[in-house]
Amino acid sequence: MSLTMRIFTASRNGQRLFGSHGARLLAAQRAEPKDIVEVPKGYVYVNNKELSMEFADITDRAASTMFFGELLRGFAVTLAHIFKEPATINYPFEKGPLSPRFRGEHALRRYPSGEERCIACKLCEAICPAQAITIEAEERADGSRRTTRYDIDMTKCIYCGFCQEACPVDAIVEGPNFEFSTETHEELLYNKEKLLCNGDKWESEIASNLQADHLYR
């Protein structure tokens, strides 16, 4: 019997080759389909089909490859977060920390003596981009000016903080309260009494926030 080996299959990447006597050889060089010496009857070379270079076939292969890769990446992200501590909190029973620069519900502040801080300069009214602030003022007997009307339409306010930045005496501020939803539109039309009440309620937190942020103001 001839010792000539009959190569049944050959890999493009030069993997294992099988002979008629069952010997297994490791190809050192790349084997192309044209290198096959003889294909016995009953055997079919299954890797002989060339990849189609049509645009539709190329896009299909690329989409399949990317989809499979993104699918594995998504699974990896999911598995990585399964064992991590949840980032959510049980609101409203739990609340996250707020920055000292947080811009919430508006308030008018007083001095420790109880005197209103606002000097009716109307800078906040002038700078408000939403035109949500309306101020009326009059002069007192001692020559100082104080507001007789200070209204804020909270439905117009965009919480930009310009009013607080423009105020020279830190009278109008945006406090730490963000839970002030209402059932009617009228409840969001704040007058001077409402704003002063907010200031009295949140004065301690407002003062500490202003102190914590004083280097950046």
Curated annotation (Swiss-Prot):
Cofactor note: Binds 2 [4Fe-4S] cluster.
Effect of residue 199 to D: Disrupts mitochondrial function and results in enlarged mitochondria. Neurons present vacuolar lesions leading to neurodegeneration in the central brain. Results in behavioral defects and shorten lifespan
Protein name: NADH dehydrogenase (ubiquinone) 23 kDa subunit
Binding sites annotated in the UniProt record for [4Fe-4S] cluster 1: 118, 121, 124, 128
CC cofactor: [4Fe-4S] cluster
Organism: Drosophila melanogaster (Fruit fly)
The keyword Mitochondrion is annotated on this UniProt entry: yes
Quaternary structure annotation from Swiss-Prot or TrEMBL: Part of the mitochondrial membrane respiratory chain NADH dehydrogenase (Complex I). This is a component of the iron-sulfur (IP) fragment of the enzyme.
GO CC terms of this entry: mitochondrial inner membrane; mitochondrion; respiratory chain complex I
Gene3D superfamilies per record: 3.30.70.3270
Start and end residues of each 4Fe-4S ferredoxin-type domain: 109-138, 148-177
